[in-house]
Amino acid sequence: MIASWSVGFDEINRWTPGLLQVSIGASISEALGIQLKWPNDLIFQQQKCGGILLESSTSEERIRIGVGLNKDAREIEGVSYAGWEDYYGDINADDMFQIIDASISSILDSSPPIENSSEILWQQKSWIKLSEILSRGVITQYDEQTVNVVGLSNTGELNAISVTSKHEIQDVGDFFIAF
């Protein structure tokens, strides 16, 4: 299942893109009972089952939120992927869309009488969801150094420490998690 939402900058101007992406992942993973791997992977039993992507369009003054979620487990080029039938059972795509839509709305919807979700609340919830994987003895490396991930910044970056220094990890390019 692939779905996308288009949201105006004015509706999300209080969010940094990094924290918004991680928060959406936390909300969806919480609703589905699965894990979140920073910054945007949805994980079930150490297998990727979906992901979240944000794309901005300054000319349209909008951000598109894309969510992809596998229905069936599969293997592609020797890599196993989970599907929602593994963790949620036999549910159709329309019902799964409703769950994901509600998860995204829980963050973004501010129409009365609903108050805006606090960024600090979602930063904390995101850290809790990310910690589910990080606390299971995974190996994390950044810039070819072993690091301990110790927090999530208010912009959605990972805070990590190595033997020699502190790091703010902004990009997955030099970051690695091994289960």
Task: Give the location of each predicted region.
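Catalytic beta-strand/loop module used to bind and position nucleotide/cofactor moieties
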Residues: 4-179
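Adenosine ribonucleotide-centric catalytic and binding domains
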Residues: 1
